């Protein structure tokens, strides 16, 4: 006996079959990472087109799998370097997306920004006392990475499925700037004073979070 489905049910099935699907069961691996000696990662990325295609969804799945594993304390389990954020071009997708998941001052911050734009930056500067690291930079570069004390950034947040605006300071603010730099083809060591890597100004805000030394 043939069962006739309602038109609404058939339409739902068609949508499921047609729309690209995101795989949220990926296991992170360091083989995903693109290092800083690759030409493309040193170049500006391109805007993401909507609706997202399968390549964009695959990138989102990888970014979330990698950083969430780090956040959950499973980096050693998967043999990866822990990170609090990752940009799309760090896993070989040359588009404007990044994902952050971290704790800062006892508050959990989590966002996956697509086509982010900086709309304001503080005049005063800031830096992490521990310095910065990067998943795509195997060689450590000693020195203070000078950034802005606060940042206001806007973009489409995939997690909330809407345009959002974030104003952030502290570790979260530093991480937003770090990941945005990646989308411009820049690395943290480009912001270290080449003549005096440990140079500081007494007016600059010092951030001293509890972070693994190799975390991005």
Curated annotation (Swiss-Prot):
Removes the formyl group from the N-terminal Met of newly synthesized proteins. Requires at least a dipeptide for an efficient rate of reaction. N-terminal L-methionine is a prerequisite for activity but the enzyme has broad specificity at other positions. The gene is def. InterPro entries: Peptide_deformylase (IPR023635), Peptide_deformylase_sf (IPR036821). It catalyses: N-terminal N-formyl-L-methionyl-[peptide] + H2O = N-terminal L-methionyl-[peptide] + formate. This is Peptide deformylase. The keyword Metal-binding applies. Keywords: Hydrolase, Iron, Metal-binding, Protein biosynthesis. It is an enzyme of class 3 (hydrolase). GO terms for molecular function: metal ion binding; peptide deformylase activity. Fe cation binds at residues 134, 178, 182. It comes from Mycoplasma pneumoniae (strain ATCC 29342 / M129 / Subtype 1). Binds 1 Fe(2+) ion.
